[in-house]
């Protein structure tokens, strides 16, 4: 919407250009760990190794502080690693950045839950400052009749479990296994997360996948006179949707029936 070429022809995709530049930078070795010449002697604890924690820790280490990142999971990345499927974003993109951050001096403490493995009082005693960079992992619920029936799951439970499965991470024995194999799947929500659930369900061998979208079907062509910061409405089909999902528009879920 921000590219003026869109008024007359195909616009230039800024995201694609930026991604190509970054990939080339890593391939050619142009992106290297920065050498920190001056240290402050200050120690900072960063809680959470998601996008915010990674960005924060790199800025702090470059400012000369000693930084330790505490992460409850086995690996860093947050929802980039555990929420976005591998078929949509390869995790090497995260790994190469974490390698750079670690080479600059950031220490990562994995499988560490604050309040369980280490207390806030201990952190306050050991560090000069503590930064909270935890992400939001609480999904938005659907308060309708039948919501508590078996077989209804949050994307926040479904997607991270599959990501751990494909990366050969151990899934907790206390966690209910969620698989779409040989099932007729309904995905409520027409956004990116819904598309991720579609692609994951298809790869798990679902019999069918239907996506319900509360909004009406948008036009196939956008209003080219509408420019940034407005978002032009246009029918978009993700790669996951094109793999075989049925899409139903203008549908509001009012209840769920079954056993």
Regions found by a protein language model. Give the residues of each.
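Iron-sulfur (Fe-S) cluster-binding segments and ferredoxin-like electron-carrier domains
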Residues: 1-24
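Residues forming the flavin
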Residues: 18-259
């Amino acid at each position: 919407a921000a590219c003026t070429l869109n008024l007359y022809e195909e616009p230039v995709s800024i995201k694609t250009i930026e991604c190509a530049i970054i990939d080339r930078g890593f391939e050619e070795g142009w992106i290297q760990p920065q050498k920190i010449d001056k240290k402050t002697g200050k120690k900072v604890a960063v809680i959470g190794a998601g996008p915010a924690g990674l960005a924060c820790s790199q800025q702090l280490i470059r400012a000369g502080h000693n930084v330790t990142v505490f992460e409850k999971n086995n690996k860093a990345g947050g929802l980039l690693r555990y929420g976005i499927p591998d078929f949509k974003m390869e995790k090497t993109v995260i790994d190469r950045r974490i390698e750079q951050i670690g080479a600059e001096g950031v220490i990562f403490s994995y499988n560490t839950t604050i309040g369980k493995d280490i207390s806030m009082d201990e952190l306050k005693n050991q560090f000069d400052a503590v930064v909270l960079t935890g992400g939001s992992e609480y999904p938005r619920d659907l308060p309708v009749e039948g919501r508590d029936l078996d077989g209804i799951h949050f994307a926040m439970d479904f997607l991270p479990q599959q990501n751990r499965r494909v990366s050969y991470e151990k899934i907790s024995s206390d966690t209910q296994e969620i698989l779409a194999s040989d099932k007729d799947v309904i995905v409520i929500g027409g956004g990116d997360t819904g598309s991720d659930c579609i692609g994951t369900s298809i790869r798990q061998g679902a019999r069918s996948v239907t996506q319900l979208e509360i909004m009406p079907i948008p036009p196939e062509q956008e209003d080219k006179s509408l420019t940034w910061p407005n978002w032009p409405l246009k029918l978009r089909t993700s790669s996951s949707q094109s793999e075989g999902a049925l899409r139903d528009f203008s549908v509001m879920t009012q209840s769920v029936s079954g056993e």
